[in-house]
Amino acid sequence: MKNEACRICLFGHRNFDGYRVVDTQLFKLIKELIDENGFIEFYIGRNGEFDVYSASIIKKIQKEIGENNTELICVLPYYNKDIEFYANYYDDILIPEVAEKSHPKNAITKRNNWMVEMCDIVVCYVERNEGGAYCAMQYAHRLGKKVINLVDDN
């Protein structure tokens, strides 16, 4: 078990229809990562269906094993009207300065890159060779991050 937190970011395409395919797989993977790494900070956006789905899986695991070894952090590209709702759901909310100061059309890309830079492991669901999730996954590969694409296991 490590003494410092392992940081894991999760992202995928905006539209996600792989619920049945990855439900058990994602649940099992997250539990294994917790067992292997001790305390984990999960960095996750809120801009796509995979983000929301992944957060719900992590919340389910937190209810099952407790919250002492995990922190679910919502990383927003900029302030939005739902931030109070998010504050009641997530353990913490972050808005990276690099994203907040960029043009709104570029803020999600900046946020995704920031999450990749901050994390040790990337867990993603990327099935197309285009879009923001694909670009973030490629960025993670370029930085030498450990990347687990759930599509590859199906």
Predicted regions and their residues:
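Acidic/glycine-enriched connector segments
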Residues: K2-N154
